[in-house]
C-alpha cells in the first residue's frame, strides 16, 4: 500500500509523523523533507491534523554514533530543538511529548538508569546479563553473531552450541522495552483522548506498581506541560 493509498483509505482525524531516531537530533536531516511530507499529507488528507511524534533520546550508555561520549542530555536537547523548530516551520501545532516523558522519567529517582556496578561489561560471560531495573530501553542481550548462524548451521538433531561462541554481547539502547512502550502508550492515549491515565487502576503483571509512576509522568507531560530539567532553554 502506498502512502497516498493509506492517506485516502479513510477520513483520518490525525496523521502523525516523526524523524528516524538516528537522525532525530540532526535538524538538517528534516529539511526539506518534513515540509514536503506535510504538504503531501495535507493534499491527500486535508481534513486530518498533522501531529509530530517526538521520539526519545537513546540510553546514556548506547555506543552507536558515539552517543555515550556526548554530554548527558545532549541527544534529548538536540532532538527537542529540532522537532519544535521544524514544527514551527511546517505549521505543525502539536507535538506528542514522548521524548519529554522518557527524559522526565530518566531524571526521576525511580527511573534514573545506572549501569550494574557488579557486572563486567568489558569481559561478559555468556549467558550472564547485567541488572537493568530502571531501563526504559531494550538494554543488553546476547545475539547470534551476524552470518554465524548460517555458516555453522548444524544438521537435523544436532545440538546447538551453548558456550556463547556464536553470540555477541549487544546493547540496544535505542528501542523502547516494555516499560518504555507502556510510558509512550500512556502519553499517546492522554494526548489524543484527553483522559487522565492516572485513573487507570490495573497494572500490567510484569510491571506491577511501577506502572503508577509511569502513568503519572505521562500525565505530567501530556496535560500539565511539565518539562524535564534538560529542556532546551532556546525554546522556553
Model-derived regions: residue spans:
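C-terminal accessory extensions appended to soluble enzyme cores
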Residues: 190-236
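Alpha-helical cap/lid subdomain in secreted, periplasmic
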Residues: 3-178, 199
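Generic hydrophobic/packing signal
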Residues: 18, 92, 187, 191, ...
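Short, hydrophobic/amphipathic alpha-helical patches that form generic packing surfaces
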Residues: 179-194
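Charged/polar positions on well-ordered alpha helices
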Residues: 89, 183-186, 220
Amino acid at each position: 500500500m502506498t502512502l497516498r493509498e493509506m492517506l485516502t483509505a479513510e477520513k483520518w482525524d490525525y496523521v502523525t509523523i516523526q524523524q528516524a531516531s538516528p537522525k532525530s537530533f540532526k535538524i538538517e536531516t528534516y529539511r526539506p523533507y518534513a515540509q514536503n511530507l506535510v504538504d503531501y499529507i495535507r493534499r491527500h488528507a486535508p481534513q486530518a491534523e498533522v501531529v509530530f511524534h517526538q521520539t526519545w533520546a537513546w540510553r546514556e550508555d548506547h555506543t552507536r554514533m558515539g552517543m555515550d561520549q556526548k554530554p548527558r542530555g545532549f541527544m534529548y536537547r538536540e532532538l527537542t530543538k529540532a522537532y519544535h523548530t521544524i514544527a514551527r516551520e511546517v505549521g505543525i501545532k502539536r507535538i506528542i511529548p514522548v521524548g519529554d516523558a522518557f527524559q522526565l522519567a530518566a531524571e526521576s529517582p525511580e527511573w534514573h538508569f545506572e549501569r550494574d556496578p557488579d557486572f563486567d561489561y568489558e569481559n561478559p560471560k555468556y549467558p550472564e546479563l547485567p541488572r537493568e531495573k530502571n531501563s526504559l530501553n531494550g538494554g543488553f542481550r546476547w545475539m547470534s553473531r551476524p552470518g554465524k548462524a548460517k555458516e555453522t548451521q548444524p544438521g537435523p538433531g544436532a545440538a546447538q552450541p551453548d558456550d556463547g561462541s556464536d553470540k555477541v554481547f549487544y546493547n540496544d539502547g535505542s528501542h523502547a522495552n516494555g516499560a518504555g512502550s507502556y510510558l509512550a502508550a500512556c502519553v499517546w492515549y492522554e494526548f489524543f483522548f484527553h483522559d487522565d491515565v492516572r485513573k487507570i487502576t490495573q497494572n500490567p503483571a510484569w510491571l506491577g506498581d511501577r506502572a503508577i509512576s509511569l502513568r503519572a509522568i505521562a500525565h505530567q507531560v501530556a496535560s500539565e506541560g511539565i518539562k524535564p530539567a534538560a529542556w532546551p532553554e532556546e525554546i522556553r
